[in-house]
């Protein structure tokens, strides 16, 4: 049917740009939430003395960040980023942003009022608000575009199904209809000041820690600090690190500024370098940085370097090479007999040690190994100059392991050669 309609046009070629952007095939999915449920949710939020908002990836998918920011600002709600999100779903240097849910204990020490209402907006995956809500008898408002996720992992007081942008806008209008600007100001003034003071101190402390970090191996905090200092204001960061809060804590993201892509909501590995090529293809006039862990890069990603080199894809690839799978190490060392015995036979990635700069050189991509804090800023600057010349660049950043079991180098010794009965 669609092809027949194109043939009927006098100038079918005029539709081709629209087809390329899929506008001609776009079906509106903007489902408006139930107004009765909106009113119930608005009352819960308005009556709360210490609310909390958790934000997830559906906010970015629905282009709803400005509306969600307006909602949070209206009631001075502290905002925590869901740990499994593809983007940064709320400006992470905003005065109301307190980090991830794991930062909540430090926030509550600063503002010692028990959370009495939660709104989880645009979230689907586990390991979020449902963990926080365990054993708490407080109202939970869950807003999502997916009806199968609402109330699935935690009982909800209000379920809001619909487009996230419309949900946020309707909540704002409902709250404004229930309270005057003066009333809202009186209810939120103290909390707004407390949250902004906490957030400012947290960001200042994080940046200062990054600035002052030094040594060999390279502290990852220093790397991210210098990257934040040197990147373009509208750069795109495609990140595939074990812990996304590193990136969100140290690099400034916002709808009008830098864009964060990754990690996937399923926490998959092996996609980031190829995704950075696609990102540069889609956004050729924006600086693109691919942030990788050594473990993730070893999930078969070197072939993307071939594409970068052949087609002159100017992407700066930075591999945080600490010779370890940190995610598995944290889990193993955090619980169980192996952790109690200080043994981890899974996570160590040395022997042989990987040299990713040499690997890049096989594809005619320039690069370097950075192991000391004094080397990192000049290396990033060289990388960005190479990007301006139209070529990719590789930085193999030899970063320090940290946390429990950081110094472990155990692995199970095994040799296929020793299995042979004859030397063939």
PLM ranges: what are they?
Residues 103, 112-114, 151-153, 159-161, ...:
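Thiamine diphosphate
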Residues 193-280:
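Active-site diphosphate/adenylate-binding microenvironment
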Residues 57-141, 254-286, 300-303, 334, ...:
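Glycine-rich, anion-gripping cofactor-binding loops and their flanking helix/strand elements
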Residues 1-7, 43, 84-193, 380-384:
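Glycine-rich, acidic loop regions that bind phosphate or pyrophosphate groups
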Residues 22-33, 65-68, 130-132, 249, ...:
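Short Gly/Thr/Asp-enriched flexible loops that form oxyanion-binding sites at enzyme active sites
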Residues 1-43:
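N-terminal beta-alpha lobe that positions the nucleotide/phosphoryl donor
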Residues 7-12, 37-51, 71, 112-114, ...:
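Glycine-rich phosphate/diphosphate-binding loops that line cofactor/substrate pockets in enzymes
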């Amino acid at each position: 049917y669609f092809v027949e309609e194109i043939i009927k046009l006098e100038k079918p070629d005029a539709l081709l740009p629209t087809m390329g952007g899929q506008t001609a095939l776009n079906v509106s999915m903007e489902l408006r939430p139930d107004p009765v449920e909106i009113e119930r949710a608005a009352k819960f939020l308005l009556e709360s003395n210490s609310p909390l908002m958790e934000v997830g990836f559906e906010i970015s998918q629905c282009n709803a960040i400005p509306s969600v920011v307006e909602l949070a600002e209206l009631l001075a709600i502290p905002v925590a980023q869901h740990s499994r999100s593809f983007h940064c779903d709320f400006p992470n240097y905003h005065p109301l942003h307190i980090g991830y849910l794991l930062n909540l204990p430090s926030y509550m020490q600063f503002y010692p009022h028990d959370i009495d209402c939660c709104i989880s907006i645009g979230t689907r995956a586990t390991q979020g608000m449902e963990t926080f809500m365990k054993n708490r008898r407080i109202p939970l408002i869950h807003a999502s575009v997916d009806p199968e996720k609402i109330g699935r992992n935690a009982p909800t007081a209000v379920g809001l199904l619909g487009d996230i942008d419309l949900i946020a806008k309707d909540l704002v209008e409902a709250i404004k209809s229930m309270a005057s600007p003066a009333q809202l100001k009186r209810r939120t003034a103290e909390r707004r000041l407390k949250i902004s003071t906490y957030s400012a101190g947290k960001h200042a402390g994080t940046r200062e820690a990054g600035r002052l970090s030094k040594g060999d191996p390279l502290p990852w905090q220093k790397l991210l600090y210098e990257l934040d200092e040197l990147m373009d204001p509208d750069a795109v960061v495609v990140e595939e690190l074990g812990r996304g809060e590193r990136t969100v804590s140290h690099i400034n993201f916002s709808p009008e500024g830098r864009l964060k892509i990754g990690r996937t909501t399923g926490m998959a590995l092996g996609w980031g370098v190829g995704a950075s090529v696609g990102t540069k293809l889609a956004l050729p006039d924006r600086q693109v940085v691919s942030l990788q862990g050594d473990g993730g890069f070893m999930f078969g990603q070197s072939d993307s370097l071939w594409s970068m080199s052949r087609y002159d894809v100017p992407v700066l690839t930075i591999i945080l090479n600490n010779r370890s799978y940190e995610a598995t190490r944290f889990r193993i060392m955090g619980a169980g007999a192996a952790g109690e015995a200080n043994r981890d036979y899974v996570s160590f990635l040395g022997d042989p040690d990987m040299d990713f700069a040499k690997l890049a050189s096989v594809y005619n991509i320039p690069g370097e190994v950075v192991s000391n804090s004094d080397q990192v800023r000049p290396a990033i600057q060289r990388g960005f100059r190479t990007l301006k010349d139209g070529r990719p660049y590789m930085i193999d950043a030899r970063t320090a392991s940290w946390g429990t079991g950081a110094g472990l180098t155990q692995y199970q010794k095994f040799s296929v050669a020793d299995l042979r009965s004859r030397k063939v």
